[in-house]
Design a protein with these regions (language model features):
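Active-site-adjacent structural elements that line small-molecule/cofactor binding pockets in enzymes
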Residues: 1-151
Length: 151
């Protein structure tokens, strides 16, 4: 149900974390339930960071601060710095140490000014997509992209 989707997502995240970290996991939530279960292989990283991709209103930022490790967004708007500031405030209000991870999915080559603005506003990672194509095309694209990023 739409008005319960945050609860559903939180329960799935908690259930997955238990499967990743406990030898024998179980979960009993309103929407997610399972008895004694085992999941192998376990992640190498003890705490798998969970980032939520969502439009960033105040309620969403509060929810992310309370339940996730960070936020993933696309640069469709020019107010990413303000949204990151809102997330940081929610993070502090939730009593979380450090700061949330922020990843931005981009489709075009950013200018040096764009990169500086992302860094200044607290973006940790920029993520480019790759073409849905065969291996040779994807590897060629990555080589071309690597050359652009280095220049």
């Amino acid at each position: 149900t739409p008005h319960k989707r945050r609860t559903v997502l939180r329960e799935y995240m908690e259930a997955m974390r238990s499967l990743w970290t406990e030898e024998e996991a179980s979960y009993d939530g309103e929407f997610v339930r399972f008895g004694a279960s085992w999941a192998y292989p376990k992640p190498v990283q003890a705490h798998v960071p969970l980032l939520v991709g969502a439009e960033a209103g105040p309620k969403t930022m509060q929810w992310i601060a309370e339940n996730a490790d960070g936020w993933m967004t696309t640069p469709r708007s020019t107010d990413i710095p303000e949204k990151i500031a809102g997330l940081n405030a929610a993070w502090s209000a939730a009593g979380r140490p450090g700061r949330p991870a922020v990843h931005v999915l981009i489709a075009s080559r950013p200018t040096p000014e764009d990169l500086a603005a992302y860094q200044e506003s607290g973006v940790d990672e920029l993520i480019w997509g790759v073409p849905d194509a065969d291996e040779a095309v994807v590897l060629g694209y990555l080589d071309k992209l690597a050359g652009r990023v280095r220049s």
